[in-house]
């Protein structure tokens, strides 16, 4: 008999920005490439990257990601990169123009949501986001708590345990 192939996650997430999903309401998502140096890719493959407090901007028709922390490569030498440098995002012209219009219209921003490899290339999931107010965050927490309790009660009923 032939050996079965292992089910492999096609796009394993390297880093995700959970804080962004808590602080912002994500309206739309985009996949884009990113221009990196060799030592940056090596550091990312080691799992050393932080999306916290990073954001994207559009300047002079080009998309840039700022405050993306990629620590220096541990086995690098004088060729190491600057950890907090601004990096260029790769998007089609139509996407950049569309995002520029949406960001300029209202109180929206571009937030990186996750980093993952796709066919050997690093991709950034970029979200068009709108900031949440404190009461919105509290409502979300309350809604999640209620959903969790409903699931818990259903589990008890299925198991025959009455509360």
Curated annotation (Swiss-Prot):
The keyword RNA-binding applies. GO terms for cellular component: cytosol. Its main location: cytoplasm. Keywords: Cytoplasm, RNA-binding. SUPFAM superfamilies: Small protein B (SmpB). It comes from the Bacteria. GO terms for molecular function: RNA binding. It is found in: Cytoplasm. Pfam families: SmpB (PF01668). One of its GO terms (biological process) is trans-translation. Belongs to the SmpB family. HAMAP family: SmpB (MF_00023). Required for rescue of stalled ribosomes mediated by trans-translation. Binds to transfer-messenger RNA (tmRNA), required for stable association of tmRNA with ribosomes. tmRNA and SmpB together mimic tRNA shape, replacing the anticodon stem-loop with SmpB. tmRNA is encoded by the ssrA gene; the 2 termini fold to resemble tRNA(Ala) and it encodes a 'tag peptide', a short internal open reading frame. During trans-translation Ala-aminoacylated tmRNA acts like a tRNA, entering the A-site of stalled ribosomes, displacing the stalled mRNA. This is SsrA-binding protein. It comes from Corynebacterium diphtheriae (strain ATCC 700971 / NCTC 13129 / Biotype gravis).
């Amino acid at each position: 008999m032939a050996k079965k192939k292992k089910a492999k996650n096609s796009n394993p997430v390297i880093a995700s920005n959970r804080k962004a999903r808590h602080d912002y309401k994500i309206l739309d998502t985009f996949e884009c490439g990113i221009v990196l140096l060799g030592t940056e890719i090596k550091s990312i493959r080691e799992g050393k990257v932080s999306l916290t407090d990073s954001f994207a901007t559009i300047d002079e028709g080009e998309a840039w990601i700022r405050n993306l922390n990629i620590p220096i490569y541990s086995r690098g030498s004088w060729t190491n990169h600057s950890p907090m440098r601004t990096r260029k995002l790769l998007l089609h012209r139509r996407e950049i123009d569309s995002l520029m219009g949406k960001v300029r219209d209202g109180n929206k921003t571009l937030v990186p949501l996750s980093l993952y490899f796709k066919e050997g290339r690093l991709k950034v999931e970029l979200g068009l986001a709108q900031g949440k107010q404190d009461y919105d965050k509290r409502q979300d927490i309350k809604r999640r708590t209620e959903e969790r309790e409903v699931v818990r009660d259903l589990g008890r009923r299925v198991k025959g345990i009455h509360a």
